[in-house]
Amino acid sequence: MNVLVINAGSSSCKYQLINMESEGVLCAGLVERIGEATGKLAHKIAPDTDSEEKIVLEQPFPNHVEAMKKVVELITDPEKGVIKDKSEIYAIGHRVLLGGEEIKESVKIDEWAKGVIRDYIPLGPLHNPANLAGIEVAEELFPGVPSVGVFDTEFHQTMPAKAYLYPLPLELYEEMKIRRYGFHGTSHRYVTKKTAEFLGKPLDEVNIITCHLGNGCSMAAVKNGKCVDTTMGITPLEGLMMGTRCGDIDPAIVPFLMEKKGLTTAEADTLMNKQSGLKGVCGMNDMRDIHAAVEKGDEKAKLALDMFVYRIKKYIGAFYAALGRVDAVVFTAGIGENDDIVRAEVCENMDVFGIALDAEKNKIRSGEPRNIAAENSKVAVLVVPTNEELEIAQAAVNVLKG
């Protein structure tokens, strides 16, 4: 049984074809610069294996339909293809940013589901239109193959009102659905399940704090296997300091800057989403570059790192208070899985919470879930590699099998 996973962006499209029996990736790729003069398609056969083979094409892709037509050609190519024809695809799983309150779990795509995605375009103006385009392309190119939408916001729909409501006039929520939705939910859900397996506990008995740290960063407080709070809000801008996003700031800064700097609404939005965070403080948004700069004595890089770590530590404390009991703090995503320096600094002086790191275990690289806590640590400190594509594929199968 094969599931094609699609993550469509405004000018890009990521995909993976996964064999669900082995959970192996048959092929994966990324189409970039869709709609530009020259596009790029990087396609990998048997990625991350000894037999990996890469095909790179540079040509115009006028739209998502033409881009995915080329992907289908590669997947079913007589010589290099991984399946004979499209009939070998059981389902298509789509990553969708925002499903609001209406969609609380993964759903088979129909006109109602597409309508909900359209309704939330004002809150997800970059992602929801692109996600919808990916769905419509799949319907055109794979007639008869069911599509399933897996939403970033699903996992956080179990938050209580005290956590998801903003202290604004309640009418704004009632009229416009202004509330915290949370994102990276597919990743948080995947690592929550993996953590329960690793700890040998039933899912509905685990209390954990999950830290998804990449270029985008978010954390979730998980009580009895369900999300009760998260750092991102109505958009992915709220919460932690990120690669180019500011995270939590005083909202009054925005009108102040618009008045004093003459910024438009769009310019203020760009400032906070694309010119802030690590990049805004030190000019770099790749943590590897920041570490290298810190080694050379770059004070701005050190400040950016300190600010990044400090925000994470604060939220661990806040979520610990919200949960009351914590079985594990879980690190995942690019920085969370690979950056032992960030993990060490986050866990430093956290004895009051029963969190202590084993310095040597922390430095070990592995693609498997692992506990890097010291023996005297009362709380497990786990590194759990995320796999959002596999989680989307599994969700698609579960929906269709009922």
From Swiss-Prot:
EC number, as in UniProt: 2.7.2.1
Record note on cofactor: Mg(2+). Can also accept Mn(2+).
Swiss-Prot/TrEMBL keywords: ATP-binding, Cytoplasm, Kinase, Magnesium, Metal-binding, Nucleotide-binding, Transferase
Compartment(s) where it occurs, according to its Swiss-Prot or TrEMBL record: Cytoplasm
Required cofactor names: Mg(2+); Mn(2+)
S-S bridge residues: none
Protein name: Acetate kinase
